Amino acid sequence: MFCELYKRGLVIREEAEVNWDPVDKTVLANEQVIDGKGWRSGAEVVKKTINQWALKIEDYAEELLSELDNLHGWPEQVRQMQRNWIGKSEGMEFSFETSTSDLIKVFTTRPDTIMGVTFLALSINHPITKKLIKTNKKLEDWILENSKGSTSEISSSLADKRGFKLEATAFHPITNEKIEIWVGNYVLQYGFGALMGVPAHDQRDYDFAKKYNIEIKQVVEDPDEKVDISKEAFIKKGVIINSDFLNGLASEEASNQLKQYGSKSTNFRLRNWGVSRQRSWGAPIPMMINKNNPNDVLPFSDLNEISSNKEEINIDDKIYIKDKDTFDTFVESSWYFARFASYKSHDKILDDEADYWLPVDQYIGGIEHAILHLLYSRFFCKAMNDLNLLETREPFTNLLCQGMVLKDGSKMSKSKGNVINPKELIKEFGSDAVRMFSMFAAPPSQSLEWSNDGLKGSFKFLNKLWNLTFLIKEQEILDAKDEEIFEELNVKLNQTVKKVTDDFERRQSFNTAISSVMELINFIPEKFLETKVTKEKNKILRNIITVSYTHLRAHETS
């Protein structure tokens, strides 16, 4: 699959700033950095520049975003998380000339604040920064000291703002005024890897400017009330001031007047997915790399089986070595559903069985995968469609994100001593009681607080249920008296059938389905036990109550 994606142009090898886990000694995707720490080791992540393989998920950013509106069977929370992660922004690009003849390009969603720019900030890996490192030891030391933290936008925005002032200056694209140039630890290597600092109207820039005594120039005011920028930035749109020919215009109108100084642009927060990992247990990357030129590569699909199994090969006096890196763990899980559907195929990646079974009707997974597996799977599905391997462009029609079983208000963990052993519970109460309580205690999408008292209650109810279904007398034909008495139960039974069917098939609300069954059982007064019912009605009753209690049904038929 990777080789096919490579041939399609969806795989690139690039030098990029990555999240490096110093304990696991491997690269982590932004999605795998939690609060600045590695998702497996818990170690503080540092920024590092390496040569790695990446999948061009950015090419699908627009479709990944727009098609979320059509995923009606997905929880809105998951769809919104993906919208935020993809992060589409409309704005403008501006170019700043510099005293060193370099050109610094920036993207901004607030072009109306262009006259409030008082500094430019470059990322640690900006081309100008890299060039200056070679001759500036202080800058090099500063970068080494400030390379900790994730490469994600959220982590950078929360980090302590630190900067290094460069001797070079930039020139404002409209006024030609001199502007300071800084290297900032909060600037990401996304887009151009540079930003225009407008401290009066951006809180991150404001904090940075306050710390380093950089000028704060207000260029937008609220038309209805006085703005005080002595304590914080004014980030809302309003009326333009202190901006020459833009004065008096509304923010939107001012942006439209700047077309001759910049160009409209669309930007996405979503970055290409770096998939190279430095783990010995991962799936191998099927590529050979030129020993003297890392950009000269050969996919295994271009080699015979003998050559691809060698650690080193010689082609036209060029030495190629097998890539020592392995795939990110999410690569295989991003398309396994398609391969499992065509597991009998030995000569093709996927066969017609994949089209027969996909998309998956009902997918179940934790919400923690919203911007990981669930997003990557959507990308892979679209790519496989473009490769003519699949007919569908979306992998999962319906998605259920199940909650977590908690004990004492927290996730079960051996270190916390709050682990519940299901085998012991099944041995004492039976699998039906454990299953019933798990489904009844909370909606499937919410976390469940485990309670042995609740489990005991489920056990008692099942005993009552068992006895009740076998106490009811059966008869082929009812007399008039029995029919009249039974009519009330018949109405309640039909209502319950309708409710439980809807809860299971459409709403996926298992707890309310079980609650309906409980209401039905509690509804049956003693007089019904003295009344004969038809075998058909008793069968319906038994079927509906054994939907959630499968082993009760098994006992009946054994």
Predicted regions span which residues?
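Residue patterns forming the tRNA-binding/recognition surfaces of aminoacyl-tRNA synthetases
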Residues: 1-106, 111, 194-293, 421-454, ...
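Conserved small/polar residues in nucleotide/adenosyl-binding loops
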Residues: 550-557
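Flexible, glycine/threonine-enriched loop-and-boundary segments that flank and lead into catalytic domains
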Residues: 78-83, 87-105, 150-173, 305-327, ...
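N-terminal catalytic cores of NTP/NDP-binding nucleotidyl/phosphoryl-transfer enzymes
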Residues: 1-2, 108-109, 113, 174-205, ...
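Long, charged, mostly alpha-helical binding arms that flank functional sites
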Residues: 88-93, 99, 221-224, 228-268, ...
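Gly/Pro-rich turn-and-neighbor structural signature
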Residues: 267-320, 331
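Active-site-adjacent "gating/activation" loops or surface patches in catalytic cores
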Residues: 173-183, 325-363
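Catalytic alpha/beta core of large soluble enzyme barrels
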Residues: 126-222
